[in-house]
Amino acid sequence: MLILISPAKTLDYQSPLTTTRYTLPELLDNAQQLIHEARKLTPPQISSLMRISDKLAGINAARFHDWQPNFTPENARQAILAFKGDVYTGLQAETFSEDDFDFAQQHLRMISGLYGVLRPLDLMQPYRLEMGIRLENARGKDLYQFWGDIITNKLNEALAAQGDNVVINLASDEYFKSVKPKKLNAEIIKPVFLDEKNGKFKIISFYAKKARGLMSRFIIENRLTKPEQLTGFNSEGYFFDEASSSNGELVFKRYEQR
């Protein structure tokens, strides 16, 4: 079973590390090509392209400039400990045991605009390059054209290595769009998280993102290997709703706190 999650815009390169083990990203040659393209952008162009403030654009221009192909624990950090958005608040990888990291390294993948596919312990230098950004490059007009089948092929390698054919899609639509489902050698299962608001159940972005992290943690902590085991997920008040679910979609609901 292979879990897919999105990266985060918020990064943490200050907190103490809970493991010293690391691996290197497998698609660094591709990342280097994107850095070459990104370095051509001025801060105002970055601001416009990413729809971010001038201050953030300056920070990210500096990150592109400072990026170097030789990754060490001094200039990079394990991806699962560097990302700090809503998904990672639910995941809480900073509390993982070494055995948890082992299982995650085999069963969890982060899709990345810059790095393509990251394993949890892959070192990562700081960046911001969302998959949906229209960064023109030698392979096309955006990052989807740049990555082509590369991400899908890398996921197929991971599935083959574990002798499995199930993908748990906990990534956002923006990131999963970089995967080619017809070329993926797997059954795709998508957990959906609905929260009650004013008597109606719907997707509330902040809660749904955190729930994707909670589900990832649930799978890792309990060493789950079969999709039917996901129905036992009950973190922070969520419960499985079989009536609303289908073969490819597992629906989890949570009542409004009153």
Curated annotation (Swiss-Prot):
Q: Which domain of life is it from?
A: Bacteria
Which InterPro entries has this protein been placed in? YaaA (IPR005583)
Record-level GO BP terms: response to hydroperoxide
Checking Pfam families in the record gives: H2O2_YaaD (PF03883)
Please give an example of a GO cellular component term from this record: cytosol
Q: Which NCBIfam families match?
A: PRK02101.1-1, PRK02101.1-3
Q: Which family does it belong to?
A: Belongs to the UPF0246 family.
The protein in question is named UPF0246 protein YaaA
Which source organism does the UniProt entry give?
Escherichia coli (strain UTI89 / UPEC)
